[in-house]
Regions:
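Tandem CBS (Cystathionine beta-synthase) repeat/Bateman regulatory domains
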Residues: 1-113
Length: 113
């Protein structure tokens, strides 16, 4: 994804903001990172649905619903290997991190095929 920064959130961002980012980003995932760019988690449409079912408010922080242990790949991994991993795991998105855990990209299945 060329402009992955448009789906970037902080852990304190509200569910309302998260929904807007998911909608505007158009790729059904948002990335949660700290002030240094370290990936903390991911949020998908399904996470939002579960939050609403569990009666969280729109003001609740995204940190309450994010997947804090997403599958990621190193920024040195080739696209064909990312595609293979995504296929094996049934994933539509893959956050890309550097050796220090800093977010540096997002690959989508749509972009890779």
């Amino acid at each position: 994804m060329d402009d992955w920064r448009k789906v970037l959130l902080t852990p304190k961002d509200s569910l309302e903001r998260t929904i807007k980012v998911l909608h505007e980003g158009g790729c059904r995932i948002a990335l949660v990172a700290d002030e240094f760019g370290m990936l903390l988690g991911t949020v998908t449409d399904g996470d939002i649905r579960r939050a609403l079912i569990n009666q969280l408010t729109m003001e609740s922080p995204v940190s309450l619903i994010m997947n804090g242990n997403p599958i990621t790949v190193d920024d040195k991994v080739k696209n064909k290997d990312i595609l293979s991993l995504m296929s094996d795991k049934g994933l539509l998105h893959m956050p890309i991190i550097d050796k220090d855990g800093i977010l540096c990209g997002l690959e989508t299945l749509q972009h890779l095929i």
